[in-house]
Amino acid sequence: MCDDDVRALVVDNGSGMCKAGFAGDDAPRAVFPSIVGRPRHQGLMVGMGQKDSYVGDEAQSKRGILTLKYPIEHGIITNWDDMEKIWHHTFYNELRVAPEEHPVLLTEAPLNPKANREKMTQIMFETFNSPAMYVAIQAVLSLYASGRTTGIVLDSGDGVSHTVPIYEGYALPHAILRLDLAGRDLTDYLMKILTERGYSFTTTAEREIVRDIKEKLCYVALDFEQEMATAAASTSLEKSYELPDGQVITIGNERFRCPEALFQPSFLGMESCGIHETVYNSIMKCDVDIRKDLYANTVMSGGTTMYPGIADRMQKEITALAPSTIKIKIIAPPERKYSVWIGGSILASLSTFQQMWISKEEYDESGPGIVHRKCF
């Protein structure tokens, strides 16, 4: 299975970024924004070969003249025409493969509507003529990537966060909780609090700059109130950032106020529980006998769990909520930004997995509904 000609493809479609590559690799070959852009004005760009749409980085770089759309909202595909364009771009431009020659493993959000998985299956077999495909739940793949089959995954990306308890490889749907608070909201919040400092960021292009500031300078405080006091008393927490035009801005308490919203969604005007309470609530919805295993195997995954200090803070918060005798372990692997993809790469290259694929023959025989029988 090692040569590129027959290797399975693994495509993790996130709300913000699409990660794609070959099963057996240790990292995705292509990572690009999940966006499709269309020209705002017809016939404006002379001599540009006038494409009717652009995907990923190209859409990003031409964003000044395009209208950008994200076909995946809060982890769920909402625009199938644009999604097809993203998959087409993934196969033909990024990976440069013929999709009819490779099995493909796709990922889906927890609690993805049934009709959506059928539609994914249908597009793969009918539009791209895949020989075989499989749909796996993102959080389950992250758990596999950490070398476990039991645990609770906090998966937080750009568009949505989920807490997913998994026992012996199976997600427990009744205990999965979703929080519509993720990276994009934190970027927006940072834009807002930087405006209070007198820096104005408003356009979509400027939002990308703020996202970069967030990724480079933000961190989670172990004790928020104490950190606020430190920031007020001295400049020790201040950092400077150079904007593309050479202007240098200074940011202080914004560095930890931004990701604090994960623990205190009221900062964003949301009434939901913070990520620590959501993990706890998810565990409490599970059978009393497996809770101990979940507390001891709490795995973080996704780009929004990449803030320095987040694991220690999580440990502290969950310890405060859980029974005092219980052992709590937060696992935050360094590669967690891509752990969904890595889990997919591991799964698709296992010899025992080869009989799990849905083949073209099975699809032709049973139709899209086969996905519920073979992927669970």
Curated annotation (Swiss-Prot):
It is found in: Cytoplasm, Cytoskeleton. SMART domains: ACTIN. InterPro entries: Actin, Actin/actin-like_CS, Actin_CS, ATPase_NBD. The modification Methionine sulfoxide is found at residues 45, 48. Oxidation of Met-45 to form methionine sulfoxide promotes actin filament depolymerization. Methionine sulfoxide is produced stereospecifically, but it is not known whether the (S)-S-oxide or the (R)-S-oxide is produced. Its EC number is 3.6.4.-. Signal peptide: none annotated. It is an enzyme of class 3 (hydrolase). Keywords: Acetylation, ATP-binding, Cytoplasm, Cytoskeleton, Hydrolase, Nucleotide-binding, Oxidation. Coiled coil: none annotated. Residues 1-2 form a propeptide. SUPFAM superfamilies: Actin-like ATPase domain (SSF53067). The keyword Transit peptide does not apply. The modification N-acetylaspartate is found at residue 3. GO terms for cellular component: cytoplasm; cytoskeleton. Polymerization of globular actin (G-actin) leads to a structural filament (F-actin) in the form of a two-stranded helix. Each actin can bind to 4 others. There are at least 5 different actin genes in this organism. This is Actin, muscle-type A1.
